[in-house]
Every structure is written in C-alpha cells, then in structure tokens.
Amino acid sequence: MTAFKYKIYLTLLYCLMISQVQAQPQLNLPATTLTILSYVRWNTPNPISLCILNNSQLSNQFIQVNQQLKSAYQIQAVSLSELNKVMCNAVFFSTYTPREEQNIINNLKDAPLTFSSNNTECELGSAFCLYQNKTRTSFKVNLASLSQSQVRVDPRVLLLAKSTEP
C-alpha cells in the first residue's frame, strides 16, 4: 500500500470513529474522561481505579468505552457509603451539586482526581468538569481542586481546557 493510500485509509478510519462518537453522544463523557486520565502521571502503580459514584448506568457506559479503547482502567460503580472503603484513584460525580461534591471530597481519606458532569461553573468541587457543548464534550479545570489530588496532569490538557471554555 502506498503512503498516499495509507493516509487516505487512516483519514477514513478516523472519520468513521468520529461519526460513531457523534452518533452516541452519551459515550462522549466516558471517552473524554478516559482520555484525560491517560495524560495523568500517577503516584501509584497500575492499574488505576476509576469509581463512578451512585450511577450504575453511567458506570456501564464507562466500562463499554474502556473496553473499546482497550484501556487498562478498573471501572467500578460505588455508592457514597462505600467510597472510603474502596480504592479509587479517580472519582466521577454525576448526581451531586458542586457543594455536595466539595463536601464529599473534603471527607475522603485519600485525595483522588475528581470529575463531574453536573458542575458547569467548576469553581467548587471536582477538578475536571465535563459538559456537553452543542455536539461535543468540553471541560473546565478547577486548579484548586486539581492541586489537592496530588497527581500531575500534562499541561497541554490544562491548555486545552482553557481554550474550550464557553
């Protein structure tokens, strides 16, 4: 296969993948979250555990996308009462207000990296706040919360977040 044909093939494959993601907008949150996680330098050895708090349907979506992307993250649905009893390197909130998120984060024994899909202002609570912006998923970063998580995130992710704010 010539280099030109190979580039066309890759472009078509990319377009196909993008069309599938746009056809399934509910999968954008997990895909965006897992992509952000791939740019994190962790203080702990693999595998990294992502806990989806009080939302088993969203947890199933994360598991599906995790398998599609062939990621090695351990995805688990956890209830609030279990949160301090299980190992969570990252926590995804989808059913709490920013104030409730902050209260939960303040009471955690560890300092996981936190994500939310219900916190568009991103001034309180989670470090990464994902939201649907027309046909795509965007995110904001709460630097104060990110610094509490004690993980290092590639600065290019932070720049991307800044440029996607509405």
Residue spans for each PLM region:
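Bacterial N-terminal signal peptides
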Residues: 9-19
